[in-house]
Amino acid sequence: MMPTKSLPDRTMEALKEAVQYAYECQFDNDHWSGEVHSNPIFTAEYLFLRQALGLDFTQDEKDGFIRWFLLQQNEDGSYGLAPDYPGDPSTTVESYLSLKMLGYPIDKPEMVQARDYMLRTDGMKNVRIFTRFFLATFGLWPWDYIPQLPLELMLMPQRSPVNIYTLSSWARATCIPLLVVRHHQPIYALPNGAHKDNDFLDELWNDPSNKKIPYSQSLWQMVGKEDLTTIAFTAADKVISLLGGFRKFPGRRYLRRTVVDWLVMHQEHSGDWGGYWPPMHGTILALVLEGFPLNHPVIRSGMEAVERYAMHDKNGRRYQATTCALWDTAVMTVALADCGLVRPNNVRLTNTVEWFLKRQCRGTEGDWRVYRPELQPGGWSFQDIDNWYPDVDDTAIVILGLLKHYPTSINSEHIIRGMNWILGMQNPDGGWAAFDWNNDKLFLNKIPFGDMESLCDPTTADVTGRLVECLGHFIRSPHAHTVDADFLRTVETSAQRGIRWLLDNQEPFGAWWGRWGVNYVYGTSNVLSGLHYFMHKGDDELNLAISRAVEWVKSVQLEDGGWGEGLSSYDDPALAGKGSPSTASQTAWSIMSLIPYVPATDPAVTRGVDFLVRFQTLLGSDHAYDRGKTGKNGKSWPEDYYTGTGFPGHLYLQYCLNPHYWPMMALGRYLRKAKGAGLTGHLEDELEGFPEPVV
């Protein structure tokens, strides 16, 4: 009988398979770009755009869309924000409208079930503002019952607490084109024609004769119930409505031209706007309403960019909310470094470095300049190309990847520029947000159009944790002595300010909230991955915070050895770390939370590592590369639950490479820890000579 292999042995085998799979998935031998799964709304709104522009669909396109929409439906007929997530009326009505536009018969069982869900829940009265907005463009909702979006917002000075630059980058890029659309109030044709009072969706209403559904309480109802800010914004909206939305006021033509100029200026050379679907959709509609023909170079390149969001496979045709080439490549680069099986002179790796360097944002673009005009550019973006909106999280993880593979590059121009940029983007409160500086005017979420509560980009624990990790790795680098001493002190001071914010914002139960990943498991992992660089004897406050977080991570481990947290924890903190079966990515995050602080033999770590090793499969995730890049060799991990976050409570994502690079990273860090403890035995030869990642 063959002796049972040790956990380090099995981990090494799993890592080799994972590296092979990663190689198979690489595009052009220099980058990775997995699909971003979300909910059906983005595909639906692509169809709305095509319908509004009068662009026909081929039968093959129709069949592909129909097949995909039907696969997304819940058993009760609804459509949710994520697979197996409770029904959402906005997602359901947009999916139903899409299927009906495509010619799918309304007497089919799937349509009957969706209709029954909407009627049973009185869903039409509860759709979000954006859904109302796009229904109004087809005459399916009265424009009078949509909040105002006055073009005069463009006139507000930058020092005002309410102006386009106090909105978050994504809200700004989305809302500015909608100012023009709201001004024009178009009515586009559906298959039954163009009608101001179109009855195309009347079967979804319990009372189709009354579609005048208020989007807020009356001012009288608000008195004594709502805060003064909400009342003031609502009152302003009512006044603007009474004045006809200012449409006939002097200067409207100038304001429309101002918006058009802003939109054209913000188009990337690739044709994109904002690297995210809503700005693409709204901007094309706005420019066409302002007289741009469909063959205009701006519109043509914009439509070409839209098509790069398309995915088509056996499951049907759909459109992504965004793309994530730079993020995927950066995280994969760190994972390859941490697993210790890729030499720095590997041609794939050197090609990836060149790919990164070409994409550093060093031009004159960038809305971040409005409030940080003296700061030198040097960030990286989330997408392949998004020069207007680099973000500090991506910049930090690119720097980590470069430093882990090439420690001697610490003084290179690209890294120093990147470091200077993220230092300059640190918020006055000591933490970091994703895209903007000091973007914390949370009262803006009280405007009638802010029902998704995502109009700002304040400091968050997960981003701050990543930045502390990046700064800590920079300071503790074996080549840090080659860096200017004053600059190192600046980095140290910045890190300490970030740590102070994290200590002040730890949850009572020991975890940290995750803005961009689900949820407390993600936030806590990012924070603990950074704090260990700054542990030292005598700092009782920091050590206590770490101890509480480590104990919390251990307390939510599942019986199978993994970790799983559901989306519902965003609605109910009592569900933090709970509510989902174990997932590969969340298990990896949790292992990385623990590795710096406990022995490699700690039961929580070994059970977690064992879970990842056991659940690695030949096919990995069903959501892996459907663009002809599914790994034919190597292994990955299955993951059907969404672990990425767009807007908590409103948009959830699954990055199809999440269940690959995070487990690689975790297993690599475990193996290094095991090596340090003398547990790797005969594996020493395989581990010898590789750069030693700091874990």
From Swiss-Prot:
InterPro entries: Hopene-cyclase, SQ_cyclase_C, SQ_cyclase_N, Squalene_cyclase, Terpenoid_cyclase/PrenylTrfase. Polytolypin and biosynthesis intermediate compounds show antifungal activity and can efficiently inhibit the growth of the pathogenic funfus Candida albicans. It catalyses: (S)-2,3-epoxysqualene = motiol. GO terms for molecular function: intramolecular transferase activity. Gene3D superfamilies: 1.50.10.20. GO terms for biological process: triterpenoid biosynthetic process. It is an enzyme of class 5 (isomerase). GO terms for cellular component: lipid droplet. Coiled coil: none annotated. Keywords: Isomerase, Repeat. Its EC number is 5.4.99.-. PFTB repeats lie at residues 62-103, 256-296, 415-456, 546-593. The active site is at 393 (proton donor). Pathway: Secondary metabolite biosynthesis; terpenoid biosynthesis. Monomer. PANTHER family: TERPENE CYCLASE/MUTASE FAMILY MEMBER (PTHR11764), TERPENE CYCLASE_MUTASE FAMILY MEMBER (PTHR11764:SF82). Triterpene cyclase; part of the gene cluster that mediates the biosynthesis of antifungal fernane-type triterpenoid polytolypin. PolA is dedicated to the biosynthesis of the fernane-type skeleton motiol from 2,3-oxidosqualene. Within the pathway, polC then converts the 4-alpha-methyl group of motiol to a carboxyl group, polB is responsible for appending a hydroxyl group at the 2-alpha position and polE is a dual functional P450, which can catalyze the formation of both the 1-beta-hydroxyl group and 10-beta-carboxyl group. Belongs to the terpene cyclase/mutase family. This is Triterpene cyclase polA. It comes from Polytolypa hystricis (strain UAMH7299).
